[in-house]
């Protein structure tokens, strides 16, 4: 079936697939696992968007784990979030461990609707499941002319040590922002740690090193060896800034914990419920503030100023956050998505189990 998958990708190599074919493939697996069709479609679209943007650990690489969670009943197949608190421009939801990408998309849409009426809209979700690549939501908001902020933490996992410590307290605690401009949006997608659990696990399994000393062993020695995270006692991910300036990442992690678990009222102070997420989604309509035109003028000036900044030696040109991802998004939309070589082999057993045709 691989040839069929490549019909929309002229001259695509054998390891590239049309994005729409991948979305349908992922949706089919989820539906056959019992997920409601509209939920499955949203989850599939977000995962493929992650790969389109180049976030290969947070795209279809997550699908085998999601299917495992569904099979175990720790990610629900059907249902709806409950609104447990609300005001004119803010709501708190209980996600009931429904698929995170679907919940996050619903939260983004609701936040944008609130922003259209109130200027800002904020949705906080407790007990969501994992929400995949945060930049995908930021892009969707920015494409609609909305500034979006998305924060996420997983209260059931701890792999990042506070600055000055060797024992873990946090997850990488990612944050994303989508900022519209008259050209491509600025897409910020970073975490409070130097690297992520997904990347370190992938490199460890492949017997490879990290690009830099982004983790520390249990004695507090910085290293590029992801294996220290799987040793006994385990090491930890270093906060953003590393051993020298990790107080910055530490502070950012605390902020994200406050904006997710703190505002949601459910987090690390409670018994762990398994892999999941506590989520903060905020939408801001520039028209409510200085006006959309003025916002665009300021952001366009900033884009031009950054692009026009003199590069330091060894740098060809200055780029903006998300610039590479947007270029990759367009290129892969046109020519096919290049999947990481571990993804399809990991999905093959699920195709067999669920009676789906492998691409």
Residue spans of the language-model regions?
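Catalytic-core signal marking the mid-to-C-terminal active-site face
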Residues: 2-5, 9-25, 258, 269-359
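Acidic, glycine/proline-rich low-complexity segments that act as flexible tails and inter-domain linkers
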Residues: 3-18, 24, 28-43, 48, ...
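Active-site cofactor/substrate anionic-group-binding motifs, chiefly glycine-
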Residues: 58-112
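A generic, well-ordered mixed alpha/beta core segment in the N-terminal half of proteins
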Residues: 91-182
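Glycine-rich phosphate/pyrophosphate-binding loops
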Residues: 146-159, 257-275
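Phosphate/diphosphate-binding glycine-rich loops and adjacent basic-rich segments that engage nucleotide
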Residues: 158-230
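Secondary-shell segments that build the walls of catalytic and ion/ligand-binding clefts
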Residues: 208-268
């Amino acid at each position: 079936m691989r040839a069929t998958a490549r019909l929309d990708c002229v001259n695509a190599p054998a390891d590239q697939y049309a994005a729409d074919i991948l979305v349908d493939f992922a949706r089919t697996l989820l539906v056959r696992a019992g997920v409601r069709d509209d939920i499955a479609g949203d989850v599939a679209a977000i995962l493929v968007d992650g790969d389109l943007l180049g976030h290969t650990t947070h795209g279809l690489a997550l699908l085998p784990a999601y299917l495992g969670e569904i099979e175990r009943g720790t990610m629900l197949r059907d249902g709806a979030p409950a609104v447990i608190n609300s005001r004119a421009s803010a709501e708190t939801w209980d996600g009931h461990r429904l698929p995170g990408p679907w919940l996050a998309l619903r939260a983004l849409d609701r936040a944008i609707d609130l922003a259209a009426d109130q200027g800002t809209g904020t949705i906080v979700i407790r007990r969501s499941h994992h929400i995949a690549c945060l930049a995908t939501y930021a892009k969707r908001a920015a494409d609609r002319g909305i500034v979006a902020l998305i924060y996420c933490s997983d209260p059931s996992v701890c792999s990042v040590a506070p600055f000055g410590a060797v024992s873990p307290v946090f997850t990488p605690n990612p944050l994303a922002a989508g900022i519209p401009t008259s050209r491509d949006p600025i897409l910020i997608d970073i975490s409070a740690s130097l690297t992520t659990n997904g990347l370190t696990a992938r490199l460890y399994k492949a017997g490879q090193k990290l690009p830099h000393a982004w983790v520390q062993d249990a004695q507090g020695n910085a290293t590029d060896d992801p294996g220290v995270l799987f040793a006994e006692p385990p090491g930890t991910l270093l906060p953003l800034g590393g051993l020298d300036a990790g107080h910055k990442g530490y502070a950012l992690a605390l902020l994200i914990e406050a904006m997710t678990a703190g505002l949601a009222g459910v987090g690390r102070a409670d018994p762990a419920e398994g892999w999941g997420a506590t989520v903060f989604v905020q939408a801001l309509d520039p028209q409510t503030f200085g006006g959309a035109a003025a916002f665009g003028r300021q952001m366009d000036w900033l884009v031009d100023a950054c692009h026009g900044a003199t590069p330091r030696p060894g740098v060809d040109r200055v780029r903006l956050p998300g610039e590479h991802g947007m270029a990759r998004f367009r290129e892969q939309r046109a020519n096919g998505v290049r999947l990481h070589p571990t993804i399809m082999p990991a999905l093959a057993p699920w195709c067999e189990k669920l009676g789906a045709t492998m691409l």
